[in-house]
């Protein structure tokens, strides 16, 4: 039988969202434009954003889309270009740009039954995680910090009980209380980005070196292995070698868990997203990428004229050749850490010949 389910109440009074913005900046140039500096500041506040608003249960609905949420964005963008050296046969130019971009959710509603914190007061890309306290060297189980800062087991944190003795855990922890178990780690949107381009010219040769910079962001990675029901025929991240075993009691990652040895925690890991919510899977996103490296040679005009051409240039170019960073060990690229199956940023080397007649 066909049925229609209405998940949220309709709202015919929805209207356009509002934005207030302020921009300021200045440009600075000295030494016959050998040094050029540009600084821009912006502030944007969005109000009447469409978001869910919880409703009294007597309305028959739990939530409705309403114009009521708000968010602010602010940042500074700096651009600096310099003419470092210019002689008859050699020149060196530099372009540097840097930006800080931050945002904050000012008003947001979350369902009462939601067990993870809301983003109000935090960035849109806020990452919250359960604060771990290392691995118990005797049992191999993960330890946690409770809201009071005490080291506890998962069973103690959630007050787990197997009331029927059948290996299914229950807890009297409320959703509001569970939200206090989580700590704010950072934002998935890196607040600091930039780029550095150096161009060197010597006679007919030209070398371009382009770096991109990303700092201050975080990424929630997929767990390196399954703590319960591990598939021994599956390819895992090399981090699995750093899990607890009797021969490796000082490991940083917990042991595989068996239902017979710890039925309450096993059941809780199995029925919840606790394992993926641990802070050990949140990595810093700080890296510098050699985005472009190009070496070109302009064939002398005397030769091109003899060949019936106006100009000719030969070059070799490499893209995304190197990444310098921390926190992405055992991952192919920091930009694809969130998904072990994602295609990393490709590296390429190309050769080109440009002829103009």
Q: Which residues does each predicted region cover?
A:
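N-terminal hydrophobic signal/anchor transmembrane helix of membrane proteins
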Residues: 34-38, 76, 192, 216, ...
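Extracellular/periplasmic, surface-exposed regions of secreted and cell-surface proteins
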Residues: 1-129, 277-357
């Amino acid at each position: 039988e066909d049925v229609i389910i209405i998940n949220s109440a309709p709202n015919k009074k929805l209207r356009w969202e509002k934005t207030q913005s302020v921009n300021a900046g200045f440009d600075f140039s000295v030494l016959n434009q050998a040094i050029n500096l540009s600084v821009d500041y912006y502030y944007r506040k969005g109000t009447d954003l469409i978001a869910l608003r919880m409703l009294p249960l007597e309305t028959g609905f739990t939530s409705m889309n309403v114009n009521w949420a708000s968010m602010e964005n602010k940042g500074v963008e700096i651009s600096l270009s310099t003419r470092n050296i210019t002689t008859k046969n050699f020149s060196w130019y530099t372009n540097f740009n840097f930006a800080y971009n931050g945002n904050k959710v000012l008003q947001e509603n979350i369902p009462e039954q939601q067990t993870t914190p809301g983003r109000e007061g935090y960035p849109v890309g806020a990452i919250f995680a359960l604060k771990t306290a290392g691995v118990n060297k005797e049992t191999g189980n993960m330890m946690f910090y409770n809201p009071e800062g005490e080291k506890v087991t998962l069973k103690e944190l959630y007050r787990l009980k197997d009331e029927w003795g059948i290996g299914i855990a229950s807890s009297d922890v409320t959703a509001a209380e569970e939200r206090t178990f989580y700590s704010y780690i950072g934002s998935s949107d890196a607040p600091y980005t930039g780029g550095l381009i150096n161009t060197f010219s010597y006679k007919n040769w030209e070398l371009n070196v382009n770096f991109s910079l990303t700092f201050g962001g975080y990424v929630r990675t997929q767990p390196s292995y399954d703590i319960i029901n591990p598939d021994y025929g599956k390819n895992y991240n090399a981090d699995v070698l750093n899990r607890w075993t009797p021969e490796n009691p000082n490991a940083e990652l917990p042991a595989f868990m068996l239902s017979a040895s710890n039925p309450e925690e096993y059941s809780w890991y199995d029925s919840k997203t606790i394992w993926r919510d641990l802070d050990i899977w949140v990595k810093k996103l700080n890296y510098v990428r050699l985005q472009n490296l190009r070496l070109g040679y302009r064939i002398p005009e005397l030769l091109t004229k003899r060949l019936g051409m106006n100009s000719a240039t030969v070059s070799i170019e490499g893209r995304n050749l190197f990444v310098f960073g921390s926190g992405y060990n055992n991952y192919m690229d920091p930009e694809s850490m969130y998904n072990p199956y994602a295609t990393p940023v490709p590296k390429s080397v190309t050769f080109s010949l440009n002829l103009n007649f």
